[in-house]
Amino acid sequence: MAMKSLSFLAALSLLALTLPLTIASDPSQLQDFCVSANSSANGVFVNGKFCKDPKLVTADDFFFPGLQTARPITSPVGSTVTAVNVNNLLGLNTLGISLVRIDYAVDGQNPPHTHPRATEILVVELGTLLVGFVTSNPDNRLFTKVLNEGDVFVFPEGLIHFQANIGKAPAVAFAALSSQNPGVITIAPTVFGANPAINPNILAKAFQVDPRVVMDLQTKFKK
């Protein structure tokens, strides 16, 4: 009887350990691809998404042109991000990957931000970048590296990270992300540009500054 109880407890413990892993894992694909359909008119419902009828899929559904061309840099931080994700390359649906091109002006940066659903791996195509990420609480450890052309750096999923052009000429980088739609939370505009605005007194206490400093920042980032 005691042996049976021990066996039951062992099995229960094993189930408790493996169940969270099972729940956290994405389901395996049941088809070669699932090109996202803009409407359900010519689609089939697979794995929670409307997918284009495979018989209507063409090579263009897996194609995105133009990453060889830089977009104008008009942002105050001096960078432009061109994203290729499931929103503009429908064939990425269910494939768990996306791509971005980042152009940096001289002294430009891709400011501190995080991707809530993806790990990022970045390669420098042109120029020199200072990159880094910060670990979670309580250590908040900073890892930084200077990257030159051809160098690669990885940013773990969910951690705050950044890139800054420290060269004397414009820079270009490409990055792959482990999600078809990784999302992005840029820290400064998210905190100070929230809509509706976060109470300045809350942010003043969090950042240990005068509320007038917070209100000035909120004015700058107001959408």
UniProtKB/Swiss-Prot annotation:
Residues 1-24 form the signal peptide. One of its GO terms (cellular component) is apoplast. Glycans are attached at N38. SUPFAM superfamilies: RmlC-like cupins. InterPro entries: Cupin_1, Germin, Germin_Mn-BS, RmlC-like_jellyroll, RmlC_Cupin_sf. GO terms for molecular function: manganese ion binding. It is found in: Secreted, Extracellular space, Apoplast. It comes from the Eukaryota. Disulfide bonds join C34-C51. It holds the Pfam family Cupin_1. Mn(2+) binds at H113, H115, E120, H161. PROSITE patterns: GERMIN. Keywords: Apoplast, Disulfide bond, Glycoprotein, Manganese, Metal-binding, Secreted, Signal. Residues 65-215 form the Cupin type-1 domain. Its main location: secreted. The keyword Phosphoprotein does not apply. May play a role in plant defense. Probably has no oxalate oxidase activity even if the active site is conserved. Belongs to the germin family. PANTHER family: GERMIN-LIKE PROTEIN SUBFAMILY 3 MEMBER 3. Oligomer (believed to be a pentamer but probably hexamer). This is Germin-like protein subfamily 1 member 10. It comes from Arabidopsis thaliana (Mouse-ear cress).
